[in-house]
A protein has these predicted regions:
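Proteins enriched for Cys/Gly/acidic motifs involved in redox and nucleic-acid/cofactor modification
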Residues: 1-169, 175
């Protein structure tokens, strides 16, 4: 099985996509590059601007049109921040937020086995544990990323991140060292 990832947005998304690639590779998938054939197409979306939302939808629409039998996945900040809108995007076979990333593989397996469309977006809860997503190597970057937190508690009027992440979740400092 081949899986292709498309990542929009910040370095956090790049890091999370790297972790997902590693997870899929460890479970027998081959990573396909943009333009190559694949059985699964996953967009890790950004919602800092509505342009990011639009690019995510456009990419998945194109992949679904070009590969009607493939599984398409919309994940990331866009479905987390706007779950009702993202759930209505029917070109995605799996719509999930930025919570339980490791469940993406399990849900993709269900879809490959013939399961119906899955929408799995859960709001973040206060006290929720930071999700460990280790990345052993970065294919396209010369520098590694160390993810230390998700979200922000600042509540700036112009920023959507607190809508997407709700509560700040931080990595234990000593485990970073």
């Amino acid at each position: 099985m081949r899986v292709c990832f498309y990542t929009l947005g910040c370095k956090v998304n790049l890091n999370e996509t790297g972790a997902l690639e590693q997870l899929f590779r460890a479970n027998g998938f081959t990573i396909a590059q943009e333009g190559e054939a694949a059985d699964v197409f996953i967009v890790n979306s950004c919602t800092v601007t509505n342009f990011g939302d639009q690019k995510s939808r456009k990419w998945l629409r194109r992949k679904k049109r070009e590969n009607p039998g493939a599984v398409t996945v919309l994940t990331g900040c866009y479905p987390q921040a706007f779950p009702e809108e993202a759930a209505q995007f029917m070109e995605a076979d799996l719509v999930c937020g930025n919570g339980d990333r490791k469940a993406i593989l399990e849900n993709v397996q269900k879809l490959l086995d013939g399961h119906e469309r899955i929408v799995a977006i859960a709001p973040h809860q206060r006290g929720e544990q930071f999700e460990e997503l280790p990345v052993e190597r970065f294919e396209t970057h010369t520098r590694a990323f160390i993810k230390v937190e998700d979200g922000c508690n600042r509540q700036c009027a112009y920023c959507v991140i607190p809508v997407s992440y709700t509560h700040l979740r931080a990595h234990e400092t000593r485990s970073n060292l």
